[in-house]
Regions:
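Rossmann-like adenosine-cofactor binding region
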Residues: 262-330, 335-337
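Short glycine/serine/threonine-rich phosphate/pyrophosphate-binding segments
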Residues: 100-102, 166, 189-194, 216-227, ...
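Adenosine-phosphate binding glycine-rich loop
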Residues: 184-185, 204, 309-383
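Glycine-rich phosphate/diphosphate-binding loop of Rossmann-like nucleotide-binding domains
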Residues: 108-125, 177, 191-281, 285
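N-terminal ligand-binding/catalytic initiation module
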Residues: 20-181
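Active-site nucleophile and cofactor-binding loops and adjacent substrate-binding regions
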Residues: 135, 182-191, 214-218, 336-338
Length: 383
């Protein structure tokens, strides 16, 4: 039953009133633009942390007093953690080549996302942030820039950098610096979706070693999630990954159509579409673009399916589209305005908090696995 009126339309489905998506999106758009435009512009700012109201305090903060910590650090670089904000300062850095589900929109256009990460790091983990947009698509220039400014920071959060360049960028920056470096699109997504998978599989009575997982998308987050799922117990042979051309098969690998990062996920099957892959699938992991999945495709999945439609800002399929065809599905999205949010904010603030607190030089696979299991356990705690 559908009831329509201006300026909104309402769909009544399964006893719930669901706002028309066009109306919902137009409302959110206006509210979001007003939110960002309100004074002061943007979402983050720098504030002093020491007294500075007298001439004497200013002489300690700057000349002549500032010379003394400079000399101490010159003699013993590790004292930067003692006399500066380095130990609680993270750089959120992007070149804007893979922003949310918006694609390559450029470095400057990525700034609202980086400011948003800064707000979340400060709010949830009390970590200070400089957001930095590097205006280059050249991996060598990007790596050099980040490595040159790395001494300022206690950690580096790489963000919204397209694949496959992101893999080499993260690896080389991590090797060249002595502070924790994490590409959140890869590892943050893997950690939080891995935790969700553990709990969803338990709720649906499925063993990880037996489930068929279909991944829509073959970029940074998709490849990292698939690798992490294997570490959790999913069989590599049970993962079917689809890129923009369809199922990643050994035929396509033989034709030179898959790069070195996609190659391990080439399956020995006929070429096909995402719809073909989803037949009898237990899990759908969407890390691609909005509107990619239909109710008809979901209807052909296995009993008690698990659907993680994590494309942002628009999921691959809306929750009400799933419930219209399945009463036995677990559905999650990356959005905070729908139930069952699976979003990186559940992970990256606390991962960096822990890494900074122990002065970790790297964010290791063991740390990622521990975070995954801790999140899964936390979700079971009473609210």
């Amino acid at each position: 039953l559908t009831q329509r009126s201006n300026p909104r339309s309402v769909r009544i489905c399964f006893g719930e009133i669901i706002m028309d998506e066009d109306w919902r999106e137009s409302t959110i758009k206006k509210e979001a633009l007003d939110y960002h435009e309100a004074e002061p512009k943007g979402k983050i700012k720098v504030v002093p942390t020491k007294p500075h109201s007298t001439a004497h305090e200013l002489s300690l903060a700057y000349s002549p007093g500032v010379a003394y910590p400079c000399l101490e650090i010159a003699e013993k670089p590790d004292d930067a953690y003692r006399y500066t904000s380095k130990g609680n300062l993270v750089a959120v850095i992007s070149n804007g080549t893979a922003v949310l589900g918006l694609g390559n929109i450029g470095a400057l256009a990525s700034k609202p996302v980086m400011e948003g990460k800064g707000l979340l790091l400060k709010t949830f983990a009390d970590i200070d942030v400089f957001d930095i947009q590097v205006d280059t698509e050249d991996p060598e220039e990007f790596i050099k820039t980040v490595c040159n400014i790395a001494p300022t920071f206690g950690g580096i959060n790489l963000e919204d950098i397209k694949a496959p360049e992101c893999f080499e960028i993260e690896r080389r920056i991590a090797e060249a610096t002595d502070i924790p470096v994490m590409h959140d699109d890869q590892h943050g997504t893997a950690i939080i979706s891995g935790a969700a998978l553990l709990n969803a599989a338990e709720l649906q009575g499925k063993e990880l070693s037996n489930i068929k997982v279909v991944v829509a998308g073959a970029g940074a987050s998709a490849i990292a999630c698939a690798n992490h799922y294997v570490s959790l117990g999913v069989k590599m042979s049970n993962i079917v990954m689809c890129d923009s051309k369809g199922i990643m098969t050994k035929n396509r690998l033989d034709d030179g159509d898959l790069n070195e990062f996609k190659a391990p996920f080439a399956v020995d099957s006929e070429d096909g579409s995402l719809a073909d892959a989803l037949v009898a699938a237990d899990v759908f992991l969407g890390l691609s673009r909005g509107g990619l999945v239909t109710g008809e495709m979901v209807a052909k999945m296995a009993d008690k399916p698990i659907i993680f439609a994590l494309a942002n800002p628009t999921p691959e399929i809306m929750p009400h589209e799933v419930t219209a065809v399945r009463s036995d599905a677990i559905i999650a999205t990356g959005r905070s305005d729908y139930p069952n949010q699976v979003n990186n904010v559940l992970g990256f603030p606390y991962i960096f908090r822990g890494a900074l607190d122990v002065r970790a030089r790297d964010i290791t696979q063991g740390m990622k696995m521990a975070a995954t299991k801790a999140l899964a356990a936390l979700a079971k705690e009473p609210v």
